[in-house]
Regions:
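Ligand/cofactor-recognition surfaces for anionic moieties
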Residues: 1-337
């Protein structure tokens, strides 16, 4: 929040160098560092031309490398990554109903549908209304299965509704497909943007999705991250062999990934991402609540920074004209015209 990341990063790198850390050759200025980041440290949408250009500038991970690592993850994680939140939900409900635990099925249903309702209600997509209608239909179907003695019939109807939901074209509802997916891939390799300065890797945290507003995904606890997201941290931990992770400034997203809030296990995404690596997290001092989340789920040690001094400035030029137009529109709308 309001942290000048390039300037802060510049200062941190030079302090590390002064302390004896191997940081290689640093750029001459903050502006030069920012230019390097914009060239080699940016995640891109599915633009083949731009991905081709970047593929020769950044770290790459082969599909084989990632797939071999991915295959070692818990089955429920692999299923959710490949089939999306509804694929996992169907498996959870089927298992709970089969062993006579309807309350567990209801808990799983409530959790997933709450998160998916929030996402779909906010998404800007032509298939939004149809997706919401299908979600309501799926909820009715699953509730009937949980409450009915003839659950098999109800559960048999759910997959066709899930297929219809996934066919709306809203990103991620059907998962990210078989590893390594399609996000940030070029010719079968995953692209991992970033810069290497000696023993320091500096890179942007991958987004949790592309087409959906990042704010809707930031703390969504039912929507799995992309394959590239997991590959990024797999690279840092197991290929770059980092000794610690530094997430510079609020907000990261790894502490808000799906699954448990406390008592994390091997199938929790935050644990998959952070593993046993210490986390160092420069964090604005007024973000105590979310900072605790990062400590609990991300093994983070918080390093507080003060809120920066800010000043309000008056609007000018086109911004002033825009405000006047907005005020005129609001006034006319309020008068019923």
């Amino acid at each position: 929040d309001n942290l000048d990341v390039p300037a802060s990063l510049w200062q941190i790198l030079h302090q590390l160098k002064a302390s004896g850390y191997k940081v290689g050759t640093l750029p001459e200025s903050q502006e030069a560092l920012l230019d390097m980041m914009q060239e080699r440290g940016v995640n891109l949408p599915r633009d083949v031309g731009e991905l081709e250009k970047m593929s020769g500038l950044v770290q790459l991970m082969s599909a084989e490398d990632y797939s071999n690592w991915f295959a070692q993850l818990p089955a429920s994680v692999r299923q959710e990554m490949e089939q999306g939140p509804f694929g996992l939900l169907h498996q959870q409900l089927s298992s709970a109903i089969a062993v006579g635990k309807p309350h567990l099925a209801k808990d799983a249903l409530d959790h997933t549908l709450e998160e998916m309702h929030h996402l779909l209600e906010g998404v800007d997509h032509k298939g939004r209304e149809r997706a919401l209608a299908l979600l309501a239909k799926l909820e009715s179907c699953y509730l009937a299965a949980i409450q009915s003695t003839d659950a098999l019939v109800c559960m048999a109807q759910a997959p066709s509704i899930i297929d219809a939901l996934q066919s709306t074209g809203i990103e991620g509802l059907g998962g990210w497909g078989a590893a390594p997916g399609k996000v940030m891939t070029y010719k079968g390799e995953l692209l991992l943007p970033g810069l290497i300065f000696g023993n320091i890797f500096v890179g942007p945290q991958p987004p949790r999705g592309w087409e959906i507003n990042e704010e809707l995904l930031h703390a969504n606890l039912a929507f799995p991250p992309t394959h590239q997201y997991l590959a990024f941290y797999h690279y840092l931990r197991n290929r770059f062999n980092a000794d610690a992770l530094v997430h510079l400034g609020r907000h990261s997203t790894y502490e808000f990934l799906p699954r448990r809030s406390v008592g994390l296990s091997e199938d929790d995404y935050s644990r998959i991402v952070a593993g046993d690596l210490p986390g160092i997290y420069p964090y604005i001092v007024d973000g105590v609540g979310e900072g605790i989340q990062a400590k609990r789920r991300g093994l983070a040690v918080m390093v507080d920074h003060l809120t920066p001094p800010l000043a309000s400035t008056p609007l000018y030029d086109e911004l002033l004209q825009l405000r006047q137009l907005i005020e005129s529109f609001e006034a006319s709308h309020g008068s019923g015209s």
